[in-house]
Amino acid sequence: MGGFFGVVSKDDCLFDLFFGTDYHSHLGTRRGGLAVYGENGFDRSIHNIENSPFRTKFDKDVQEMKGNMGIGCISDYEPQPLIVRSHHGTYAITTVSKINNIDEIVQDIFDKGHAHFLEMSGGDINATELVAALINQKENLIDGIRYALETIDGSLTLMLLTPKGIYAARDKYGRTPIVIGQKENAYCVTFEDFAYRNLGYHDYKELGPGEIDVITTEGVKTLVAPGKDMKICTFLWVYYGYPSSSYEGVSVEEMRYRCGACLAKRDNVKPDIVAGVPDSGIAHAVGYSNESGIPFSRPFIKYTPTWPRSFMPTIQSQRNLIAKMKLIAVHELIKDKKHKVEEKV
């Protein structure tokens, strides 16, 4: 999946950018990146975070980077943000995307003229670089972003950092979210709305499907109005999203309670306890327990200090290992009992 966070401030933005980006660590464990713009132009840092958390890897960078605007990301695959120099000028870009027609887009760009892409290990093309190439096909950034949203088969939500501000664009069907927060002297742009709560921001707006906004120190301006065709990914509520998040005004935690309650109404089993598999299964189990009246218990404990979410690695054997090692059973709560176990709905 992946997630991102951006800041436009009248003051230095690094504190908010660092912690806001870190609050997206549940969405990816592959790479993290920060890009900022200030008096000295653009600066960027990208690190592998597979074996060390985002905060540890970027603590030194944050002390050295300076700027009043910036974007950061947690990526589950390609390195980003990228800094791109084109006829639009220089900009930094980060994306949350799933592009199904990469080969067709690449060939179309090749057919239109001289172009090249840098291959990542394994021969894959960086999807964020491909999005930048699509944007650069048009005469201005707004038309370029619209063209990218329309051309991609799959999903694309992005942030683009320029010397003037941050352009934010939501997937044309709203599959993935993008939210703007506000506080005195600053705006933020984020995938997860809870990411700005502890930083002092309050809700400003949630972009609609295909909406493009530009955020500057002076305010937020809508450049392309939202469409009406909403097809948001429901797995955000069921699994990907953090419990304290909300999408389209619907709380993740409350949605999981309701899903568990619906299961309880459907079932006719009578277990001794209801249990959830951490992390997302816990709230489903709580909802089931509340509705059924059957006690909730925690016979499966996740070892949170070191084990990440098991869906992140691309190698199945690694996913199997993490899934096995991260959960520790409490045998005293399991032995001789009938269980109703919720993994996720």
Segments (PLM) and residue ranges:
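Glycine-rich phosphate-binding loops at beta-strand->alpha-helix junctions
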Residues: 275-284
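Short, glycine/charge-rich flexible loops or terminal/linker lids adjacent to PRPP-binding catalytic cores
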Residues: 293-343
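Alpha-helical hinge/cap motifs
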Residues: 97, 344-345
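Structured, non-catalytic alpha/beta "coupling" segments that mediate domain-domain communication
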Residues: 209-211, 283-297
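Short alpha-helix boundary/capping motifs
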Residues: 133-137, 291-292, 316-317
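Conserved short alpha-helical segments that host acidic/polar catalytic motifs at enzyme active sites
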Residues: 1-209, 214-271, 277
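The Walker A (P-loop) glycine that initiates the GxxxxGKT/S ATP-binding motif of P-loop NTPases
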Residues: 276, 343-344
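Generic intrinsically disordered, low-complexity segments enriched for polar/acidic and small residues
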Residues: 1, 236-237, 285, 293, ...
